[in-house]
């Protein structure tokens, strides 16, 4: 744009940029829209090197897309945030945000200032969260374990493992309850990362299993080592136990050929001393991220200890946390002397190498500091196993959230329909400009039941109208307030009581997705100017060789 102030780039302002942003958001939402709900479809994504991913998870789909538009990137980050914070509801949060933007754009085109729309949206979001917490939550104490299983099944219903929902829901609930520990404040905590998920392709989904203890996809370093150790003392090392070699560039001038042997002997003695220091503390299970050469293995075999090499760093960290061990990247202390103390060892009741499914695994059972659990997944191929892992991660997060927040809300579009009716009535009580924005917010929420119905090949107009009628009755007539649990039954194509049907989602999933979607919509709505700078041109007068040829500079 030329003018009094020259900007070396493209500048678009006002109406143009807002419409562009809304279109970008809508196109991102359209990608994930068809994967929402229990009958949502999967996406196949192929990256630039030909790796194939088949998934139904909104966050994974958007993470693998290479998005150019800055406003669309906001929505991709939004799905990622929802995945990290809550673990589920990633698709719906993007769809709601895009719908909020679309409706806000309509209002701005009718000459309503974006600031009024933004304040209306903020107010609507606040009211919606308050209404959920006061009227729509079901306390988990009155439902017990069934509630956890139902919440896990609801999360899995749209995924590849939805067919065997009962089997996997029980497995997930058992896994989360197995890793429970109490923090300093006396609050129960469920670190989902303590559940190690291993994948082995072959057999059917139903042959997946839950194992008590941490399963390591490794075997002992030598066949001469014991395969089972009771009262294990575990050393976690982040370095290799190999014959020490002199650093490159170190030169030793020798006057006597016999001294060569002494140097070689010293090289092997350094490692031997290290191993003896470790074994002297009573360590009988040694896990290392590096390699262990044959010479070092000999010492462990003689001592009757179990040594495991090439353990993944991620696994080592989790085992150290569970057993109370300290991960050491060197034995040297601040003075430069090599020491190893018994306090650095972790403890477990038993470490055993077992053949599970078709693989040899090392199981670390009953660790001292925290308990851990492992799930071994079976599936037809790698794509299936990867998708099963993502589905289980979502379900684990959902069960964790239900246990921590102790409340759930009905699924199947029930919350969105109830909020839509409530906010429409609330909007009419407002005398200010925010009234229109709140009404649009209410209309935007209906995109979830609408999309659910469309994906299930049902008549969305008819179904959503019936659903709204039930919720209106529930809010107007106090005697029929039980109708507020009505959501969609997508397999039969009619509304039903989702509290009785056991379709539940954690309250925090709904609350966070509303808050995040509103914030993302507001962030994009506030933008009224986009300046995209041109890439910096090189200082070189002629640029590249081709430019020089074209310009005739080489003809001089």
Swiss-Prot record:
InterPro entries: Chap_CCT_alpha (IPR012715), Chaperone_TCP-1 (IPR017998), Chaperonin_TCP-1_CS (IPR002194), Cpn60/GroEL/TCP-1 (IPR002423), GroEL-like_apical_dom_sf (IPR027409), GROEL-like_equatorial_sf (IPR027413), TCP-1-like_intermed_sf (IPR027410), TCP-1_chaperonin (IPR053374). Gene3D superfamilies: GroEL, GroEL-like equatorial domain, TCP-1-like chaperonin intermediate domain. The modification N6-acetyllysine is found at residues 199, 400, 494. Its EC number is 3.6.1.-. Keywords: Acetylation, ATP-binding, Chaperone, Cytoplasm, Cytoskeleton, Disease variant, Epilepsy, Hydrolase, Intellectual disability, Nucleotide-binding, Phosphoprotein. ATP binds at residues 37, 89-91. Belongs to the TCP-1 chaperonin family. Changing residue 38 to L: In IDDPMGS; uncertain significance. SUPFAM superfamilies: GroEL apical domain-like, GroEL equatorial domain-like, GroEL-intermediate domain like. Changing residue 159 to R: In IDDPMGS; uncertain significance; the orthologous yeast mutation induces yeast lethality suggesting loss of function. ADP binds at residues 37, 89-92, 158-159, 412, 505. The modification N-acetylmethionine is found at residue 1. Pfam families: Cpn60_TCP1. Its main location: cytoplasm. CDD domains: TCP1_alpha. Component of the chaperonin-containing T-complex (TRiC), a molecular chaperone complex that assists the folding of actin, tubulin and other proteins upon ATP hydrolysis. The TRiC complex mediates the folding of WRAP53/TCAB1, thereby regulating telomere maintenance. As part of the TRiC complex may play a role in the assembly of BBSome, a complex involved in ciliogenesis regulating transports vesicles to the cilia. It catalyses: ATP + H2O = ADP + phosphate + H(+). One of its GO terms (molecular function) is protein folding chaperone. It is found in: Cytoplasm, Cytosol; Cytoplasm, Cytoskeleton, Microtubule organizing center, Centrosome. This is T-complex protein 1 subunit alpha. GO terms for cellular component: acrosomal vesicle; cell body; centrosome; chaperonin-containing T-complex; cytosol; extracellular exosome; Golgi apparatus; heterochromatin. The gene is TCP1. The modification Phosphoserine is found at residues 6, 491, 544, 551. Mg(2+) binds at residue 88.
């Amino acid at each position: 744009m030329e003018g009094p102030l020259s900007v070396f780039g493209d500048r678009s302002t006002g109406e143009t940029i807002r419409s562009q942003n809304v279109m970008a958001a809508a196109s991102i939402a359209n990608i994930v829209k068809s994967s929402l709900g229990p009958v949502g479809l999967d996406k196949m994504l192929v990256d630039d090197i030909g790796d194939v991913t088949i998934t139904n998870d909104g966050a994974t789909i958007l993470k693998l897309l290479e998005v150019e538009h800055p406003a669309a990137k906001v929505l991709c980050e939004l799905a990622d945030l929802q995945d990290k914070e809550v673990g589920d509801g990633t698709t719906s949060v993007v769809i709601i945000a895009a719908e909020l933007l679309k409706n806000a754009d309509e209002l701005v085109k009718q000459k309503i200032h974006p600031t009024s729309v933004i304040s209306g949206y903020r107010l609507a979001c606040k009211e919606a969260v308050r209404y959920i917490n006061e009227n729509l939550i079901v306390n988990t104490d009155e439902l017990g374990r069934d509630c956890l299983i139902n919440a896990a099944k609801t999360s899995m219903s749209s995924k590849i493992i939805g067919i065997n929902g009962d089997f996997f829901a029980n497995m997930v609930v058992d896994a989360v309850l197995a890793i429970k520990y109490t923090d300093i404040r006396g609050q129960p905590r469920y670190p989902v990362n303590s559940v190690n998920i291993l994948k082995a392709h072959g057999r059917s989904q139903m042959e997946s299993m839950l194992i008590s203890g941490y399963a390591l996809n490794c075997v002992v370093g030598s066949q001469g080592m014991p395969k089972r150790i009771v009262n294990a003392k575990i050393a976690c090392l982040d370095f290799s136990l190999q014959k020490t070699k002199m650093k490159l560039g170190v030169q030793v001038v020798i006057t006597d050929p016999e001294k060569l042997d002494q140097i070689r002997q010293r090289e092997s003695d350094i490692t031997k001393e290290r191993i003896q220091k470790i074994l002297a503390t009573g360590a009988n299970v040694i896990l290392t991220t590096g390699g262990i050469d044959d010479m070092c293995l000999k010492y462990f075999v003689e001592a009757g200890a179990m040594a495991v090499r090439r353990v993944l760093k991620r696994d080592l960290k989790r085992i150290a946390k569970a057993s109370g061990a300290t991960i050491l990247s060197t034995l040297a202390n601040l003075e430069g002397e090599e020491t190893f103390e018994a306090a650095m060892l972790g403890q477990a009741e038993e470490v055993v190498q077992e053949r599970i499914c078709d693989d040899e695994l090392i199981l670390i059972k009953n660790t001292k500091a925290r308990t851990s659990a492992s799930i071994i997944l079976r599936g037809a191929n790698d794509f299936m196993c990867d998708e099963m892992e993502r589905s289980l991660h979502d379900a684990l997060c959902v069960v964790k959230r239900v246990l921590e927040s102790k409340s759930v809300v009905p699924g199947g579009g029930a919350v969105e329909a109830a909020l839509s009716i409530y906010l429409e009535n609330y909007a009419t009580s407002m005398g200010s400009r925010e009234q229109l924005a709140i009404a649009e917010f209410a209309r935007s929420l209906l995109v979830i039941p609408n999309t659910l119905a469309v994906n299930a090949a049902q008549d969305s107009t008819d179904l959503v109208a019936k659903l709204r009628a039930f919720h209106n009755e529930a809010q107007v007539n106090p005697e029929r307030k039980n109708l507020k649990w009505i959501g969609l039954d997508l397999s039969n194509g009619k509304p039903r009581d989702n509290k009785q049907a056991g379709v539940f989602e954690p309250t925090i999933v709904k609350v966070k997705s509303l808050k995040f979607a509103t914030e993302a919509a507001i962030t994009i709505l506030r933008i009224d100017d986009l300046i995209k700078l041109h890439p910096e041109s090189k200082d070189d007068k002629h640029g590249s060789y081709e430019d020089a040829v074209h310009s005739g500079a080489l003809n001089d």
